[in-house]
Structures are given as C-alpha cells and as structure tokens.
Amino acid sequence: MAGMKSSPSQDEEACVLAIQLATSTVLPMILKSAIELDILNTISKAGPGNYLSPSDLASKLLMSNPHAPIMLERILRVLATYKVLGCKRSELSNGEVEWLYCWTPVCKFLSNNEDGASIAPLLLVHQDKVPMKSWYHLTDAVLDGGTAFNKAYGMNIFDYASQDPQFNKVFNRSMAGHSTITMKKIVETYNGFEGLKSIVDVGGGSGATLNMIISKYPTIKGINFDLPHVVGDSPIHPGVEHVGGDMFASVPKGDAIFLKWIFHSWSDEDCLRILKNCYEALADNKKVIVAEFIIPEVPGGSDDATKSVVHLDAIMLAYVPGGKERTEKEFESLATRAGFKSFRKVCCAFNTWIMEFSK
C-alpha cells in the first residue's frame, strides 16, 4: 500500500503471521479432537517426564484403524508446537527416528485433575456447533444491531440452553469445570472470607462455589441465591441454604455478598441494578466480593492473560446482549455509582480478579 514501507524480513514475518491467522481454526479443532479421543488424559496419566509414541498412544486408546499412529503423529505435532505437549527425538534400532510426546503444565489444565475438573469442557462448548453458528451472524449484528447468537437462534444463549438439553449439559459441564479450578485457587489465595458469619452467593447455581468456601470456613453460614428453578434442583451441601429469587428484585442479607462471573453477562445498567440491591442487603462496613476478568485499558497487549480476556470479551459480544469484560476503572465506576464508599482490587486467581466493594 502507498506510504507503507517495510523491509524484506519484516514482510516475511508479517506474511507468515497472516497465514497463521488465516489458518487459526486449526488449533481449537485439533484440541477438540484430542480431548474427544482422550489423548490428553492418557498422556497426563503417564505422568510428567514419561513419553509416549504415537503407536503407544494408539494402543492405549484401543484404536483399530491401522493408520491411527500416523494420524495421531500429525495431531501431536500441532499440540507440541503450541506447548500443549512436550516432545523429544528417539532413534530406533533400525536407524529410523521416532518422536515421543509428554505432559506439560498446559496439558495439566486440559486434562482431568484430582477433582475430576478440567478446562477441556470449556474448549468443547466454544467449539460446539450451537455457539459456533452465532459467529456467522456477527457481521450482520455489527451492521444491523443486536447480538449474533440471537440472530442465529431468535433468543439469547441462556434461554436456548434451557430448551436444548444436550447443549445445556455441555454448557453446564464447561462452567462447572472452569469454576471448580478457579474457586479452588481463590479459596487458597484470598483471605477475605475469614471472620465472616454469613455469605450470599448471587447467581450461585448448584451451590458448588459456596460448598468450596464453607469447606474451608465451616463457621460461615452460606446462602446460595439463584432463580427458583435453578436452586430447586440443587444438591444439599452442609452449611448452605438454597434460596430462590430474582437478583434484579432483591438480594438476601449477609455479612458479605459474592458474585462470580455475573457482571460480564450484563450491561452497565443491569449491573447497577444488581449492585444497588446488594448495597441495600448489606449493613454498613460490609462488602460485596466480585470475581471477574479485567480487560486492560490499553489495547494491543500480546501476553497470554490479555489474549485470554480479549477472547472472552469477543465471546460476550457474540453471545450475550449487553455482556462485556470491563476495565478496572469501569468496575470502580460501577461501585461508586451504586453507592459503595471504597473499591479495592485484591488478588488474582487464574486471570479472575477478586475485587471488594465496601459499604
């Protein structure tokens, strides 16, 4: 283009990146197959530092296709390129070279941990045919207004999930795995639950989050607050009372109110309605504990944390009317506008930030 000059080496690098971006659907779809084939769990079970060949893997997975080892090799190569797996060269007795593959820290989070939780279901839900269809409507949403998912299905993703049992199962499994991993880290890292007599989890679903908190702090009374049809099917947890209601109408009283990944699904106006109800439910000097992703003020960051939250913001753009990830300043503004006297960013757990809004 006129006025834009670059060196041959810069052109080489830029064109290679453009080609990588043009083929970027490869990685999530390869990961999807690796998860469905149980490749990552199988390699993780071998343990750190223990390597498997494609033939070993095909044998462990009981694959009858004679071409499976060759096909697995090509899948494993992609995963090793993105550091999902480690690899090393091995020379066979006949002089041929074989590549062996092993566990990495990234693989740890994409395979089942000791609690049976994994980030893998989160990947599967975003590659599922249901939400994938919405991306084909994003251009129209930008041009005409509205949300891509609603244009694809005539309703929002939450209403759709309630009508599609199979997708609802995939969706709930993805949220449960991500939540379990993140909450375990929050409970280990954040000490703001200490000394509380009671805590209300707004939008707490089945009560699993409160159960993790109260397992560490058994003297706290937990109130799991969600829509009546949600809490009506929730399991019994020691120290947890299930309460049905609408967070846009009122919120139960407690020493603290906890909201995890709630605000990114709502517009600023809706967030303010929720926060004002939380404010009314708290005594003076009590707090709302917010767990959310924080998007950087300045675009263009290339670190993994920034890429992750920018991806999530784009997902909100496509799936949820009014939903978005927010900057620290935007959270502070919401707290101030809702009447809270102080805002504090406390700590981070796997890119989810804990913030306190104090009355």
Swiss-Prot record:
Short name of one Pfam family: Dimerisation
Catalysis performed (reactions):
a 5-hydroxyfurocoumarin + S-adenosyl-L-methionine = a 5-methoxyfurocoumarin + S-adenosyl-L-homocysteine + H(+); bergaptol + S-adenosyl-L-methionine = bergapten + S-adenosyl-L-homocysteine
Q: PROSITE patterns, from UniProt?
A: SAM_OMT_II
Please state the Enzyme Commission number of this protein.
Answer: 2.1.1.69
Keyword Methyltransferase on entry: yes
Q: Name one GO molecular function term.
A: O-methyltransferase activity
Q: Which family does it belong to?
A: Belongs to the class I-like SAM-binding methyltransferase superfamily. Cation-independent O-methyltransferase family. COMT subfamily.
Q: Identify the keywords attached in UniProt to this record, alphabetized.
A: Methyltransferase, S-adenosyl-L-methionine, Transferase
Q: What is this protein's name?
A: Bergaptol O-methyltransferase
Q: Which GO terms describe its biological process?
A: methylation
Which residues participate directly in catalysis?
H264
Q: Does the keyword Transmembrane helix apply?
A: no
Q: Under what conditions is it induced? A: Constitutively expressed.
User: Record-annotated residues binding bergaptol?
Assistant: H126, H264
Activity control, per UniProt: Inhibited by Cu(2+), Ni(2+) and Co(2+).
User: Which amino acid positions bind S-adenosyl-L-homocysteine, per UniProt?
Assistant: S179, G203, D226, D246, K260
